[in-house]
């Protein structure tokens, strides 16, 4: 497993899977990669990958709608790096199919309230539960209520369906299973593109009915199978809006400036810190999906001149990032590591856990 962060975080399913490529695949630690995948798939319950384990008795905790869906992307990346289809077929494929089956029929384990609606979109959570990564809660007060049809969850759902269909074809599974997966994926993509585009803000809704500008929409472009076609103007508009409103040298802000409850500085007592956690504070790990979305737009561009222009802008983004984090790694609060989050105004002070796995990985 992977520890989410020091000094206080333990091993979390969501954090482990987001950190998976950067910590084990990039370093060619494929034996560790297999062990991590086996760890977080051995306790799947009703289609849910554990989001963690109790620090008291080590029982699995299932307070997450995204951990199971993140698994598919990491399995795909594991294959991309290793071509190890045998391991996936023998140890993971049946479990992946069962996750799809459970999400389709509905899951109410630990009040996750996950179900596939008639419009082929996944709905999850309630006013009382927090099961996405924006999970701050103060007592009974949910700071960022995101119950309903979340943008990143449905992007991950489409991606999961397409990856499973790809594996089903590779493993010569039943033709009916392959066709069902592809049909469901096509219907999900159609519905997503019809409902999630926010024409007014030139981006995607964070949750259907919620027009706050947040970075979660990047997952619609960053995954192996983007639910938004990277060639389209919608994709470019969305990416430009995120770049303009949320990107800075240290990561992406969790909420655009000007939105209600926007907060730039992470400070004060535990209540004030929790209130601001996902309300404008900068998170470095979001640079990962931002970069992947950027690359997918570049790969999809047909115009040679425009592609060259995009490549030039991407190189400038990478160089600026290298400069920022070379200094941070050598002169920051934690030499050799990257913090959990940063303030969103100068001097962009590092805050939260002083060594965060997904910050380093992404």
Residue positions per predicted region:
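Extended glycan-interaction surfaces of carbohydrate-active proteins
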Residues: 1-11, 35-56, 108-149, 187-285, ...
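Aromatic-rich carbohydrate-recognition surfaces in CAZymes
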Residues: 10-16, 20-131, 150-154, 158, ...
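Alpha-helical structural elements of signaling/regulatory helical domains
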Residues: 28-29, 84, 88, 173, ...
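Short alpha-helical functional segments enriched in proximate histidine and acidic residues
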Residues: 102-103, 160, 164-167, 188-195, ...
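Surface-exposed helix-capping loop/turn segments at secondary-structure junctions
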Residues: 109, 166-176, 196-201, 300-302
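Active-site neighborhood of glycoside hydrolase catalytic domains
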Residues: 154-190
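Extended, well-ordered alpha-helical segments in internal regulatory regions
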Residues: 161-169, 220, 224-229, 289-302
